[in-house]
Amino acid sequence: MGGRYKIAVLPGDGIGTEIVQVGVAMLEAAARRFDFAFDFEEAPIGGAAIDATGEPLPAATLELCKASDAVFLGAVGGPQWDTLPSDKRPEKALLGLRAGLGLFANLRPARILPQLVAASALKPEVVEGVDILVVRELTGGLYFGIPKGIFPEKKGGRRGVNTMSYSAFEIERIGRVAFEAARERRGKLCSVDKANVLEVSQLWREVLVGLAPEYPDVELTHMYVDNCAMQLVRRPRQFDTIVTENMFGDILSDEAAMLTGSIGMLPSASLGSGGPGLYEPVHGSAPDIAGQDKANPLAQVLSGAMLLRHSLRQPEAAQAVERAVQTVLEQGYRTGDIAAPGAQIVGCRAMGEQLLAAFERA
């Protein structure tokens, strides 16, 4: 397959350093097997960057990311930085990174692996076989629309205002990402909106319907957001790929995530138009277990598989990494967060060793 790729590695805070080490090792193993190469370059972000430079996202870190083929991020944040002004906290680095890289599409898979069906809060017969991808628009909608703020009223009192706003262009570009993703999966795309009430959702639906003829191999359906929230719990297997606006996606992706039983298993990708994508686990920095070799690296490893698939167009390598994850789970290895009766509990490093062994044996 060939090719040499530059990856910006941002371990961040808490367990970030531990899980990123495992993720990088798996990427290196994939490169060896599938005949391509990586140049990894590490940079600080979040609290680690604040301690080193005074800024959560140093200019040098952002420039490295812009010059890379993809960005591989661990996690940011921790209680020692909670007293800082809001614009100086570690989490602000993520917003700056998304804006600086022009990322507008967030992809969050929620897949129930057969070995972890019992970890879900729902009955096995409800969640068995669930494999959902939520495509969330990241840069528009209620979180960013103008006007916004808290304003005085003429007769006294105050009024809070937020605006849900989308242009047809913004809807079309997220729609294309979703159609392409659905085409690579099972060919079913559910667009989630509130078109029975909101004009912005009526435009959303109109644009998605207009795109559909370009993707005749993808079945497009529509669902109101309140019904979707119910159906995710009632009959989640009906969904393949979901596309929705920012706030709806924020809520629904978290709901879909909890079908799986452990947030420690969930990867994510944030994509733009042609530049580097950002790949990170959904979970946070878990400062309470940092440095104790207790972290679950599987979400980081699966984020690496998404990096291989979406930014590097190496689908066979991505599948091989995902198979290694399934293999170690089949063998009974678990970190503490996904422990089950009869399982062999291992730490982060040992899980990484088992992953590499499974990958090399396959």
Swiss-Prot record:
Binding site for Mg(2+): 226, 250, 254
GO BP of this protein: L-leucine biosynthetic process
Protein name: 3-isopropylmalate dehydrogenase
EC class of the enzyme, as a word: oxidoreductase
Residues the entry annotates as binding NAD(+): 78-91, 284-296
Listed HAMAP family: LeuB_type1 (MF_01033)
Annotated function: Catalyzes the oxidation of 3-carboxy-2-hydroxy-4-methylpentanoate (3-isopropylmalate) to 3-carboxy-4-methyl-2-oxopentanoate. The product decarboxylates to 4-methyl-2 oxopentanoate.
Entry's family note: Belongs to the isocitrate and isopropylmalate dehydrogenases family. LeuB type 1 subfamily.
The organism of origin for this protein: Gloeobacter violaceus (strain ATCC 29082 / PCC 7421)
Entry binding sites for substrate: 98, 108, 136, 226
Cofactor note: Binds 1 Mg(2+) or Mn(2+) ion per subunit.
Cofactor(s) listed: Mg(2+); Mn(2+)
Catalytic activity line of the entry: (2R,3S)-3-isopropylmalate + NAD(+) = 4-methyl-2-oxopentanoate + CO2 + NADH
GO annotation, cellular component aspect: cytosol
Organism ancestry: Bacteria, Bacillati, Cyanobacteriota, Cyanophyceae, Gloeobacterales
Pfam families per the UniProt record, alphabetical: Iso_dh
Region forming the signal peptide: none
Keywords: Amino-acid biosynthesis, Branched-chain amino acid biosynthesis, Cytoplasm, Leucine biosynthesis, Magnesium, Manganese, Metal-binding, NAD, Oxidoreductase
Oligomeric and partner information: Homodimer.
Annotated site residues (Important for catalysis) in this chain: 143, 194
